[in-house]
Amino acid sequence: NDKVLYHYLGFLFFNFKAQTPFRDIYTQWKALNSRDKFLKDIQHTIATRMLDRYLEETEKAAPDYQKCLKTMTEAISDFRENWYNNDKELYQILILLDIFRILDSKSIKKLPTDYFTRKSGQKDGEDKEHILSQTPRKDNGEITTIKTDWEKFVQSEDFKDIRSQMQDILNHSDAELTEQELIQLQNLLNSAGLNSIGNMALLDLRINRSYGNADYTHKRTIIFQEYMNQKYVRPHTLAVFMKGDIDAREATGIPLNRWTLEDIKRNTDKIAKEIGKNFNAWLTQNN
């Protein structure tokens, strides 16, 4: 019945099974005989497990986790960092963001046990989703190689800062783009933040495939309809598609029905600060 312990223990068990035998955790609980001390130990363990990947081999004997945390938050806050192929860490951070939202709310229900990791499976699994579409795609989900599709794509207001560079590539291309030209275009998009963690969310495959290569407004509508129809949508995913931080939105004047490069930068910065704040607290609270 302890909402906080449920979520942090669940995250630890499901994401670090090999390093976290249940017997060891139970022994730890009995030895401490204090809920608060036990929680602090669990949070500290989560932070160190996630930061271990930033340790050099020579640092493992005497790890400096604050140094690792600095490296981690810098990687998160750099909106040009490519997180798309960093699946394990990406999923863990996105799921922690779900947990933070749940624990900060009195109304959001507990995370179902099968959502402590990315759900796999062809029918009821999940996949990482670009909030702002990364590239123009065909109906089957493949990246289009048709020049006119790309020319239409780059006219979006979202790409105004890199439009001239993208258009320069397209001006020198034939009706069908070469592999090299596609790589050049994708590299430009990545430099603008399309593969940053601030443009990523975990979404049910069924929902993801239901709207194909739709724009943000259409994605937003479908996700909201699914949520209203009692389909489970992760709290962090719902928040970014519903743009829950209304106050910040009103202050910047960015419209609610678009997800812009400015949104990506803002979300990236928010995630870095949230992870940094929590991990720093977890690392120091036992000192």
PLM region spans:
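Flexible coil/loop and intrinsically disordered segments
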Residues: 1-287
